[in-house]
Amino acid sequence: MEPDFQDAYHAFRTAEDEHQLFREIAAIARQLGFDYCCYGARMPLPVSKPAVAIFDTYPAGWMQHYQASGFLDIDPTVRAGASSSDLIVWPVSIRDDAARLWSDARDAGLNIGVARSSWTAHGAFGLLTLARHADPLTAAELGQLSIATHWLANLAHTLMSPFLVPQLVPESNAVLTTREREVLCWTGEGKTAYEIGQILRISERTVNFHVNNVLLKLAATNKVQAVVKAIATGLI
């Protein structure tokens, strides 16, 4: 069944929260011929363990098994999506570390699948996956999916981000002044407070005043963390 993209766009835009939006995404996935749908978003922070949000209609128990087995860290679909926005067709790799992933997926009824990634200005990475238990993909279907998934993945991620990013990356809500951004940029260049003061023609005390304000706004413990957070969220 060919989706009505105009109606879908309206339904997406009027979704009141991320859960309603995902239900609309899953409905389009079914119209495209896929039993199952998954949308995952990975935030740029925390750096050591980025926050992740996952929504899915997979068979009961699969996502719990996926997460408990640490498949997210070895999933070649995620790896491919992180480096390319092209249509990804399962299986992406038959490397030894992913062999169990594909085997377990087939056992769960996830035999055929495609995925498409996208990014937002805040550095959030999104991956949309469509899957089914049977019916191999044809060349004609892949041609259709190349267009449909590009539209669906990008719109889904664009509209999901305003729901998810403020929750998972509260630093993204920070509003920095022009001077605070300048001080952060020069800090990122390795300049000391004294040197930044000379460059901006302000006192060292004023530089430190702006730095302290930034630390509070970004919930950072030091200047290094503040710069990392600001870059990761697109604030500078």
From Swiss-Prot:
Keywords: Activator, DNA-binding, Quorum sensing, Transcription, Transcription regulation. GO terms for biological process: quorum sensing; regulation of DNA-templated transcription. Transmembrane segments: none annotated. The keyword DNA-binding applies. Gene3D superfamilies: Transcription factor LuxR-like, autoinducer-binding domain (3.30.450.80), Winged helix-like DNA-binding domain superfamily/Winged helix DNA-binding domain (1.10.10.10). Coiled coil: none annotated. Residues 193-212 bind DNA. Residues 169-234 form the HTH luxR-type domain. Disulfide bonds: none annotated. This is Transcriptional activator protein SolR. The gene is solR.
